[in-house]
Amino acid sequence: MEFKQGDRVRIEKNGTVYEGKVMPSMEGYITIKMNSGYNAGFSMDKVKITLLENNGENTNGGLNGGKEHKTAGEEVQKSGKKLPKVAILSTGGTIASKIDYRTGAVTSQFTADDILAAIPELREIADFKGRVISSILSENMDSESWQNLARAIVEEIEAGADGVIVTHGTDTMMYTAAALSFMIETPVPIVIVGSQRSADRPSSDNAMNAICAALVAISDIAEVSVVMHGTTSDDFCEIHRGTKVRKMHTSRRDAFKSINSRPIGIVDYNTRKIKTFIDYIKRGERPLKFNPGMEPKCALVKFTPGSGPEILDHYIDSGYRGLVLEGTGLGHVSTKWIPKIQKATDAKMPVIVTSQCLNGRICDRVYDTGRDMLKAGAIEGEDTLPEIALVKLMWVLGQTDEFNEAVKMLREDISGEITKCCFK
């Protein structure tokens, strides 16, 4: 039978019928993307294949499993109600992904307007303005991407937005959340949201996450937060502070957890009510401030038993301006590393120490190794997560070239990254 990629076919095997679009396949096999969003592969000599007449675009895709909606550039009808104004900025990632029915691949092609069209409930919550900042997978984000995004957010707030939602890939969401937390002092909510499962999948979390994010965007929580599923069920989303959140699972819908802190609160998906657990900065409490400076030449180095101290030589000799060490337990590295820490600080490179344990607080005053690290100039990261410490270091070095001032700032709690007492 003659068929090509993107053709719609029916496959019969052992009395069971499968329908879908043809994907790239190995010789002798056929792989299809079924309407459910799942892939199925078959040996061609063991099945009956029928080419279907309807080879147009699939009408079972889209973000909500229904008809595909308007794509980039097409206007989405605005709500006539007087609702809060919320800007939704798209950067790509799974929440902005859809199936390319020609190849069956998942691509970041949906825009903010597409998301709004596909989740009509959003229009009952706020009057949205959609804007595409980028269409990339989150592993391709960098400090320049964070700065561009932050500038766009500030522009929307200055233009009168009552809240801002950023759609983002989940893999590096915590880095972006931290960067925005340090760069922007905001008078309105800035909410980062994504999804673990692409929109074509029946188990996609995108719609619920987006609705919960919209509710936070019109709330009085004037901080940078991450809003994602709180459990594997569709019952509530958690609101995580942007400097206390971490992705803790590769694929679960409730992958994001607040570390060393409780979440700011939760959004009940059924009642649409928000319940808060900790103090937070309220809407209008502080004026808008924007400090976008970032120093990209910083590194996070994980210590492992037996790893040689010459690792640090590479960064020191290559012109890096700061280091974060992810040590063991209370924040330790081999004693062989201590002279290299001294070499770095002598070169005016701040060195922050964090823990691989994630939960708990650094204390380098208990054992001799830790005390020697402090004598060499290491800075205790307190209960800051390693990844957040890296972003903080990049931001601080983007604000000052003066070593002592940088050290002073790194020891301070700037945006909730250091807490007085760790959550147990």
UniProtKB/Swiss-Prot annotation:
Residues 58-79 are annotated as: Disordered. Pfam families: Asparaginase, Asparaginase_C, GatD_N. The active site is at T94, T170, D171, K247. GO terms for biological process: amino acid metabolic process; regulation of translational fidelity; translation. InterPro entries: AsnA_fam, Asp/glu_Ase-like_sf, Asparaginase/glutaminase-like, Asparaginase/glutaminase_AS1, Asparaginase/glutaminase_AS2, Asparaginase_C, GatD, GatD_N. GO terms for molecular function: asparaginase activity; ATP binding; glutaminyl-tRNA synthase (glutamine-hydrolyzing) activity. PROSITE patterns: ASN_GLN_ASE_1, ASN_GLN_ASE_2, ASN_GLN_ASE_3. Residues 84-406 form the Asparaginase/glutaminase domain. It catalyses: L-glutamyl-tRNA(Gln) + L-glutamine + ATP + H2O = L-glutaminyl-tRNA(Gln) + L-glutamate + ADP + phosphate + H(+). Residues 66-78 have a biased composition (Basic and acidic residues). Its EC number is 6.3.5.-. SMART domains: Asparaginase. Keywords: ATP-binding, Ligase, Nucleotide-binding, Protein biosynthesis. Heterodimer of GatD and GatE. Belongs to the asparaginase 1 family. GatD subfamily. Allows the formation of correctly charged Gln-tRNA(Gln) through the transamidation of misacylated Glu-tRNA(Gln) in organisms which lack glutaminyl-tRNA synthetase. The reaction takes place in the presence of glutamine and ATP through an activated gamma-phospho-Glu-tRNA(Gln). The GatDE system is specific for glutamate and does not act on aspartate. This is Glutamyl-tRNA(Gln) amidotransferase subunit D. It comes from Methanosarcina barkeri (strain Fusaro / DSM 804).
